[in-house]
């Protein structure tokens, strides 16, 4: 339709916005003349991974004061996982929250995920999520459950299980998934596979994260027939646009996870190859798959996938490339190149990159042992959920390379590493137990309690797909164009 044909616009809008008729019509109808900001175009671009186009359109509308476009712009900043961008996103959400329930929900979720949050921020997150839920916003109860499970000391009057029971009794559709999250967090997931299956079968058509949970259940049980049927449903749902490419990627990673049982790496590769053109992050998942299962491709294929991931500015591609240079198996060892790529990944929010950087500095791969850098990066990794970083910290303080041995600190991190124990970490803890005097033990116990409080209580559940996606945008939410 030509711009001149848009004459049915109220005088009120003409007065409020001093723009030409064509620009104003584009901003309101969102069908848009060429080159003008368009929220529907931005929404569709974001879903297919074209963040540059989405950002341009969101920004143009956000500058006109549209709160839903401001939310979309902030969503893009959060997705970068860059701490500085996330800080900007928090400010943007906060500005829009006065008029937008979606912004309230986003800000609440962001505060739940915020490292080193204050008591005031946790209470604000609770208030925002409750307000957003009352106004019909989805994806609010699971973040609330995460908040209560992460910081029980901040909400002493709340019993997470009782709260979830109340939500389930009230028929809230998110309550079942909150229960699944609680099982993951408490380390009792394997004891409740039957209930997880029941919850997610009932919610599968409305909550596509359940594809990941059901795939996990069937993988753990070794139920190949049920897994095949589920994958058939997944492929059909993806083909008709009912499930996003990111969900297919998550299921593929379950199939390739050795810790869950017998893998099906070939099917995982087929799924990833199908969605990678629409979901650039899947190029990195393919690279990781070939790295884990070398029979699926040679080094050239691995590097081709990494290159595509880097072209799409995927931090996980930098992480994997840094690991290759760090390990020196697939590629020649090169500590300087490893540091370069790992730093890029760490700056973009990849927790594992801090672990490998810490090991670079702890082991002196760059020429000298740099203990303070090692501690900084390993602690960041450990507090971000990388359990192997705790063992590395225990080794660092125990061995004393470049620093004076500190058995008390070593004992603290050896204890923390027992969340996922190995024979090596258990042996080190036993040795340290014998070294400490009663006074040293008391001091170390105080440090351990302090570190546990700093980390919260979500160690086992925080990095699950369910937990991570609960803190991100809900792709099934109604797009914002109707409210503009």
UniProtKB/Swiss-Prot annotation:
Region of interest (Disordered), ranges: 447-484
Cellular localization per UniProt: Cell outer membrane
Signal peptide residues on this chain, from the entry's feature table: 1-32
Record's keyword terms, sorted: Alginate biosynthesis, Cell outer membrane, Lipoprotein, Membrane, Palmitate, Signal
Lipidation (N-palmitoyl cysteine): 33
Pfam families: Sel1
Family stated for the protein in its record: Belongs to the AlgK family.
Function field: May be involved in the polymerization of mannuronate to alginate.
Protein name per its UniProtKB record: Alginate biosynthesis protein AlgK
Taxonomy of the source species: Bacteria, Pseudomonadati, Pseudomonadota, Gammaproteobacteria, Pseudomonadales
Gene it is expressed from: algK
């Amino acid at each position: 339709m030509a711009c001149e044909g848009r004459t049915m616009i109220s005088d009120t809008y003409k007065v409020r916005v001093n723009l030409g008729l064509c620009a104003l019509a584009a901003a309101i109808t969102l069908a848009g003349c060429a080159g003008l900001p368009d929220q529907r175009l931005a929404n569709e671009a974001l879903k297919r991974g074209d963040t540059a186009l989405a950002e341009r359109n969101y920004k143009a509308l956000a500058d006109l004061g549209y709160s839903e476009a401001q939310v979309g712009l902030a969503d893009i900043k959060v997705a970068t996982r860059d701490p500085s961008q996330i800080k900007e996103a928090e400010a943007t959400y906060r500005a829009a929250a006065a008029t937008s329930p979606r912004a309230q929900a986003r800000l609440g979720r962001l505060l739940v995920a915020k490292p080193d949050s204050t008591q005031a921020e946790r209470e604000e997150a609770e208030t925002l999520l409750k307000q957003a839920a009352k106004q019909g916003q989805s994806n609010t109860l699971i973040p609330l459950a995460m908040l209560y499970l992460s910081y029980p000391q901040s909400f002493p009057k709340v019993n997470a299980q009782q709260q979830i029971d109340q939500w389930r009794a009230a028929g809230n559709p998110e309550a079942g998934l909150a229960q699944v999250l609680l099982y993951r967090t408490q380390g009792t997931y394997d004891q409740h596979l039957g209930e997880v299956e029941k919850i997610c079968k009932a919610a599968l058509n409305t909550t596509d994260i359940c594809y990941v949970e059901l795939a996990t259940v069937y993988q753990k049980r070794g139920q190949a027939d049920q897994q095949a049927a589920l994958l058939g449903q997944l492929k059909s749902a993806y083909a008709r646009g009912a499930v996003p490419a990111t969900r297919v990627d998550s299921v593929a990673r379950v199939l390739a996870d050795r810790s869950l049982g017998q893998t099906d790496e070939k099917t995982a590769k087929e799924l990833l190859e199908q969605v990678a053109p629409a979901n650039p992050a899947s190029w990195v998942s393919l690279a990781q798959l070939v790295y884990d299962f070398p029979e699926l491709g040679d080094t050239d294929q691995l590097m081709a996938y990494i290159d595509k991931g880097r072209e799409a500015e995927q931090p996980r591609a930098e992480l994997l490339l840094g690991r290759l240079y760090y390990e020196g198996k697939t590629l020649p060892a090169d500590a300087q190149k490893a540091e370069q790529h790992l730093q890029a990944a760490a700056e973009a929010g990849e927790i594992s990159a801090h672990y490998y950087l810490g090991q670079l500095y702890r082991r002196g791969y760059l020429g000298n042992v740099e203990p303070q850098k090692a501690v900084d990066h390993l602690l960041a990794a450990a507090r971000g959920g990388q359990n192997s970083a705790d063992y590395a910290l225990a080794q660092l303080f125990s061995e004393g390379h470049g620093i004076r041995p500190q058995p008390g600190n070593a004992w603290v991190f050896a204890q923390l590493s027992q969340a996922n124990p190995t024979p090596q970490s258990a042996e080190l803890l036993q040795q340290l137990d014998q070294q400490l005097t009663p006074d040293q033990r008391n001091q170390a116990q105080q440090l351990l309690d302090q570190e546990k409080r700093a980390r919260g209580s979500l160690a086992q559940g925080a990095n699950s797909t369910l937990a991570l996606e609960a803190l991100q945008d809900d792709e099934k939410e109604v797009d914002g164009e109707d409210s503009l």
